[in-house]
Amino acid sequence: MKYNWQYSDWAKFNYSDSVLESLLIEFAFEIGEIKGIIQSLSNENQQDTILQMMISEAVKTSEIEGEFFSRQDIMSSIKRHLDISGNLAYIRDKKALGVGSLMVEIRKSYQKELTEEMIKFWHETLMKANLYINVGVYRTGKEPMQIISGAFGKEIIHYEAPPSEAIPLEMKNFVKWYNEFRVNPSDIKNILIKTSICHLYFESIHPFEDGNGRIGRALAEKCFIQSLNMPMPISLSSIIKKNKKEYYNELKKAQQSLEITDWILFFSKIIIEAQRFAKQTIV
């Protein structure tokens, strides 16, 4: 099996943006609805809305990876990193500190240019309670990075990422692509396209020993709210978790080719459904 990064013209993704035409009116409507609702809220209620969405994202992005935290632990972690005073509960699971901190970092830095240092810092922030991996640095070693499922002896290899020696250049190119793909907030089609490619591109590189899925979803969120130029409440992981099997099937398919029209259509629908979820949560 040949993977996307093994093609000579990697990472020149091919796609037809015409498939998004039927989604654009709906996407624009949801953006307008949420903006209107947020603007009608008091500052305190706006902050609470963002907080609740950050909690949902932290809980669900962790659940996708098989880690389960209480909303109370996540809320206390986020509030501490936002310097919100009050009676904060003791955080029982220290890993909740990491994912809560990451949610805050995404929002604090959403307007900043993406850098490798930022991505490494996010990884260190997320995984600081993990004693078994190297945090904040790219993976090294000769063993292939493979996405595997199945019982021992009957493993199925879904994907094999680029070798570790290729990671520094791959990440340099990824960050360069991200920053050069500039999107006007009114260019809603390219907001969907860039966010979809951003997630796929990073997941295909898989630069860290662990935590790649969570960092990849964090990057998709940053890409989305940075492109809109506002910290829009959204929880992509809530919708990915609900459609987990389909998500992994589509990701696997997209990582076998540079033709990613189906992936962009699928992930764009995830974004729009995440907007609907945010709206329902607010109202």
Where on the chain are the PLM-derived regions?
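FIC/Doc superfamily catalytic core
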Residues: 1-283
